[in-house]
Amino acid sequence: MIPRAPPSTQLFSAKTAVNQRSQTFKAFYATIRSLRQPPPEPPESPQAADNDFILSILKANPSLRDTRSYLASFGVQPQRPKTLEDKKLPEIVIPPPPAPKLTASSTKVVKEEKHAPSPVINSILNPIYRRTALVKIQGPFTDVQLDSITRGLVYLEKLGMVSVIVVESDGVPKGEQEERKLLIDEIMRVVTSLEKQGAHARPIVGAVVRLGPKPGSEEESEPGFSPPETHIYPSDLTPIRSSLRAGEIPVLAPFALDSRCRSVRVDANDAIAGLACGMVEAASENPSPAAHEDGSSDSDAIDLTPLRLMIINQRGGVPSYARSGYPHLLINLQQEYDHILQTFDPRWKDSHPHALSDLALARTCLRYMPPTSSAIMVSHKSPSSLIGNLITNKPAVSSSLPHALLQGNLRLTPHTPTLLRRGLPIRVVRSVSDIDKEKMTALLEQSFGRVLDQEAFYGRLEKTLDFVIIAGDYDGTAIVTNEVCPGSSQPISYLDKFAVLPSHQGDGTVDFLWVALHDESYGLGHPFSANPNGGKGGKGEGRDLVWRSRSNNPVNKWYFERSTGHLRMGQWVLFWADAEKRLKVEESLRGSAGLSFIEDWEHGRLGKWADTITKIPSSWK
């Protein structure tokens, strides 16, 4: 007879069985649930992030000139070699004393001197010379959008550009009871996101700028230009200097000290404008630390002069009426600022509420920043554009490309960034007497590297000149002449010279010139050609523009993209750009007839052009 277990034991066994069934059911449910809802993906590996960083650099597609320009700003700074003039030679030569006996202490000194870092080793360990950029983050942004923005800023830091960030949020109305707390929360979100991307960041919640224009700035201001509404003294930059020297990205709130030393909220644009002016002044008073005698330099050396202004928002660049609301690609602020204000569609004030105020901010900041600096207005959807702008300092797409080419292959989108430069004034003259021949000759000879036959060249212009476009103080020019064509009642519009000083190549002057040339010649008659360049203001009938270039000219690739067609003539290549207004009228006929369709006015024109252009004498000695 088997003894029966006591009731308590039976109850315990029953509970154990129930628990086992419950755990089995939970495990089964968990298994099914994991099948229905896959677990979250693991965080991005460092290798994937590095690959993304490398791809962003490759997508920038920098040219050789772009690479040299980047290395000039961020590479190892060359040091001035020492000369004998720096040292005074002794007048009396004293024989050297007998060599002392080596001791433990002297051996230690010798070893220390032997292992002093050399300039070559220092350049390898610290290959990047860090510069600063002013960044405005115009929120609100979601966490995903903010991570995309901060990832781009961290990439910039790897390339030597350290951001000084000012955070603004439309989601925090001015006058809110908890306004200060909400703004600090936004700052902490940015700091957290930066550290999540592997950077070090420091929140600066105190006021750095002071309210009101700097005393005496009104007297120094230029006509038509107002100084910033905030100012900075060098001592106010201590928190930013400390953060940068510690390898941290400073993140600031738009606070300013008023006359009673109270911290009050100001517009982020006013805070950034004051920072731009103050940082440039501080850098000029205390220039970058010089290298040590052994050629090494401090690894924490940072130039406070901002090289870039980056405005990151929801919408991207400034909309343009010439591009049917798509963004401007490149803006010459000296020439186009007032025109953009006049042609800004009132409907864009709702879709792009900060476009005009950011345009004014860029104009103010670039007035204080170095001439090579630029500003970029970019959407949070295009963080890689920041890297492209840093390396190339050019717009995402060239503004001088034909409109059909930009919009036809989707190279232009509503979120395409806008690059802004201080730029140069553009003017048009139509008489040889209005040309400064000395400056024009210097420009042409420096650009082409040849000696100009001045008497023959200017003598021919007296008979054939149509117009001359001049950028700045003869920093660039486009000379167009009227060449008589046998058998035709209309002369040929011939681009005789297109030149830019070597010092201005790569800074946007070429695009500024070509856009003005387009508006004054083959683009004339279109509404978007009414630019304030001192020419015809878009009124008139466009004409075909013809020019030639040597077949081995490296600039021909640039010409191919901007011309309607080309014809090879031995050692020359003939280019032409058809009048766009006429093409617009005949666009439907071309589309229905196919590629072999030729208009009446096209018959025989290439032969006439080639025959006329080849007879133009050389302008060089």
Curated annotation (Swiss-Prot):
InterPro entries: AceGlu_kinase-like_sf, Vertebrate-like_GNAT_dom
GO cellular component, one term: mitochondrial matrix
Domain N-acetyltransferase: 424-600
Region (Disordered): 213-233
Pfam hit, one: NAT
An MF annotation (GO) of this entry: L-glutamate N-acetyltransferase activity
EC number: 2.3.1.1
Keywords: Acyltransferase, Amino-acid biosynthesis, Mitochondrion, Transferase, Transit peptide
Transit peptide, residues from-to: 1-77
First-tier enzyme category under EC: transferase
Gene Ontology BP annotations: L-arginine biosynthetic process; ornithine biosynthetic process
Catalytic activity from the UniProt record: L-glutamate + acetyl-CoA = N-acetyl-L-glutamate + CoA + H(+)
Pathway this chain belongs to: Amino-acid biosynthesis; L-arginine biosynthesis; N(2)-acetyl-L-ornithine from L-glutamate: step 1/4
Subcellular localization(s) per the UniProt record: Mitochondrion
Top-level taxon: Eukaryota
Family: Belongs to the acetyltransferase family.
Task of the protein: N-acetylglutamate synthase involved in arginine biosynthesis.
Protein's UniProt name: Amino-acid acetyltransferase, mitochondrial
Organism: Coprinopsis cinerea (strain Okayama-7 / 130 / ATCC MYA-4618 / FGSC 9003)
